[in-house]
């Protein structure tokens, strides 16, 4: 018998169904939420978990929130203990493993899934059995069966990198949350002041942007425009920040009726199709078009994946392997969707080579693998599917072709210019979700020809502050700054909202007074520890653990020491 452990019940059922006729057995627990079951099929026993089964907690003697408990968490390695969240799994897993010839970890195929697999192996400590890893890219039954024929080795380094993150976040979160709640309860409020390494750094981004907007002082500037035929020209020195200079030039040209065209340039510009879709792009596009949080986008994608409609949705990769059969996949998309004609044209013209982006050998990019016209009456899930489908079809499309036109001319020797862009071939934009960016159409002009000036104007404008973050722009900034991972970023905005540090209105993110005050009190003593650079550095260290270049426990110890110094600095400043 082979023991297979999955991360979720639905995945356990999908694997069992792919392998053959199965029967369900109760291993323990009562009621829908606490019942532990197995699926028996062929010579496999499949046990589904419910996510992480173990967690870090403080021992009973440190449950009381005091400053001394903070010191213990930061200085005593035994102050955090790993315990079962669901105690009922331990004995059934051990009993089954004793009689198994092999243990197959079939948790989600990403770093978090590898870490949950590590929890399974810790549960089976002392039971020596061969361990293999099932790595799935889709939940299509034939793909599941094929994956069982090419099981991998379990990636301990990847699992340890997540273990390091979880333990560092527990040390920092437990100690800082207690320290802040005890020290600032009369300044910020008596509610718990939650602190997290990624969470608080993300809050800092939102607060810094709000301050930038609040402190922004608009500066006036002037633009001089002229209308010739039906085309709007602008003075080439615009914008003017010197009012006197702007008015001087305006007075010089405002009554002139002659525009001398000096140059006309036309050039063809090709805009290439997008790179294949990874998680970050899916979250950005999904939250922008569907007006929902990134975590909800990921939840919808998970549903589509478990329904064998798309490939695995947690992926960094933007380059397909050479073995991926796009012709076969496009054939599946020829019916039952609104873009079958476009897919048919791709096949007819043999356009089946996708664009390439960054390479990360975790999974294929996110790909539609089934053609549907609705999804269980879930409109949002279907709309996300259509975005993924549009993106996939667009990566094969021909480039879009534009003609860019620039017209230069003189009014009273003052240089004016007009720019235009005309779309001449839609290319991949025929199916892509973003429309092509065209500039204003301009009239036909001939060099060394004089035209009538229909009017000259001077416009006073003001500089504007940067916009507040939206869900998608904050996600993009987090990725740019190296804050969090593809697994942790989507939930972070919702966590900040749940803890009343930010609020969202029409997809625009605002810090609350509580969030502003928290940053105000900790940025001076903890500036180094809440900066994006610090969080990014920790993520880089965890990547070293994943590559086998660093010991995870040494990383935890060094970050523990660093944060103990941060707390000491905070207390010194407070006193």
Task: List each language-model region with its residue ranges.
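Basic, low-complexity terminal or inter-domain segments flanking catalytic cores
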Residues: 2-3, 22, 123, 153-154, ...
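Conserved short loop/turn motifs at secondary-structure junctions
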Residues: 1-3, 108-110, 189-192, 266-275, ...
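Metal- or metallocofactor-binding catalytic centers and their adjacent structured scaffolds
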Residues: 153, 243-277, 283, 449
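Amphipathic alpha-helical transducer elements in NTP-driven molecular machines
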Residues: 9-12, 16, 43-46, 50, ...
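C-terminal or mid-to-C-terminal helical accessory/interaction module adjacent to the motor/catalytic core
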Residues: 85, 90-91, 98-99, 139-228, ...
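Intrinsically disordered, low-complexity regulatory segments
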Residues: 1-174, 439, 457
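Structured, non-catalytic alpha/beta "coupling" segments that mediate domain-domain communication
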Residues: 30-62, 200-245, 393-441, 547, ...
């Amino acid at each position: 018998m082979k023991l297979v452990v999955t991360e979720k019940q639905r995945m356990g059922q999908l694997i069992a169904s792919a392998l053959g006729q199965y029967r369900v057995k109760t291993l323990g627990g009562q009621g829908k939420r606490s019942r532990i079951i197995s699926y028996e099929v062929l010579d496999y026993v499949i046990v589904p978990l419910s996510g992480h089964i173990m967690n870090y907690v403080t021992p009973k003697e440190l449950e009381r929130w005091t400053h001394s408990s903070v010191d213990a968490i930061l200085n005593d390695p035994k102050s955090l203990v790993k315990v079962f969240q669901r105690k009922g799994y331990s004995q059934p897993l051990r009993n089954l493993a004793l009689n198994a010839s092999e243990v197959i970890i079939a948790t989600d195929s990403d770093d978090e899934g590898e870490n949950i697999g590590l929890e399974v192996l810790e549960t089976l400590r002392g039971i020596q059995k061969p361990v293999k890893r099932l790595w799935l890219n889709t939940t299509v039954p034939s793909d599941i069966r094929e994956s069982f024929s090419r099981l991998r080795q379990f990636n301990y380094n990847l699992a340890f990198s997540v273990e390091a993150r979880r333990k560092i976040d527990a040390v920092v979160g437990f100690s800082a949350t207690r320290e802040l709640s005890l020290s600032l309860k009369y300044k910020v409020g008596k509610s718990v002041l939650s602190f997290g390494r990624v969470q608080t750094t993300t809050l800092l981004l939102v607060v810094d942007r709000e301050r930038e907007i609040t402190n922004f002082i608009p500066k006036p500037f002037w633009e001089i425009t002229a209308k010739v035929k039906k085309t709007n020209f602008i003075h080439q020195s615009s914008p003017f920040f010197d009012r006197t200079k702007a008015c001087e030039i305006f007075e010089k040209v405002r009554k002139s009726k002659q525009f001398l065209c000096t140059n006309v340039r036309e050039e063809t510009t090709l805009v290439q199709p997008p790179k294949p879709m990874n998680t970050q792009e899916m979250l950005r596009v999904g939250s922008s078009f569907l007006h929902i949080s990134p975590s909800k986008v990921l939840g919808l994608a998970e549903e589509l994946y478990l329904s064998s409609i798309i490939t695995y949705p947690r992926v960094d990769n933007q380059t397909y392997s050479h073995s991926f059969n796009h012709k076969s996949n496009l054939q599946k998309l020829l019916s039952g969707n609104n873009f079958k004609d476009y897919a048919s044209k791709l096949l007819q013209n043999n356009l089946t080579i996708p664009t390439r982006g960054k390479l990360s050998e975790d999974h294929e990019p996110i790909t539609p693998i089934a053609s549907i016209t609705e999804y269980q009456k879930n409109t949002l899930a279907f709309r996300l599917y259509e975005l993924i489908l549009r993106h996939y079809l667009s990566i094969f499309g021909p480039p879009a072709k534009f003609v860019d036109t620039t017209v230069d001319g003189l009014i009273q020797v003052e240089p004016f210019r007009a720019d235009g862009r005309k779309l001449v071939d839609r290319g991949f934009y025929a199916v892509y979700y973003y429309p092509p960016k065209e500039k204003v159409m301009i009239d036909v002009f001939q060099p060394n020809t004089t035209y009538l000036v229909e009017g000259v104007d001077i416009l006073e404008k003001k500089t504007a502050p940067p916009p507040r973050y939206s869900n998608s722009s904050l996600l993009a900034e987090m990725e740019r700054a190296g804050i969090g991972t593809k697994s942790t970023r989507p939930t972070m905005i919702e966590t900040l909202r749940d803890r009343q540090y930010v609020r969202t209105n029409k997809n625009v993110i605002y810090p609350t007074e509580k969030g502003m005050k928290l940053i105000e009190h900790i940025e001076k003593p903890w500036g180094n520890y809440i900066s994006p650079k610090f969080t990014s550095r920790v993520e880089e260290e965890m990547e070293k653990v994943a590559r086998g270049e660093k010991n995870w426990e040494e990383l935890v110890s060094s970050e523990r020491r660093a944060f103990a110094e941060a707390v000491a600095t905070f207390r010194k400043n407070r006193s």
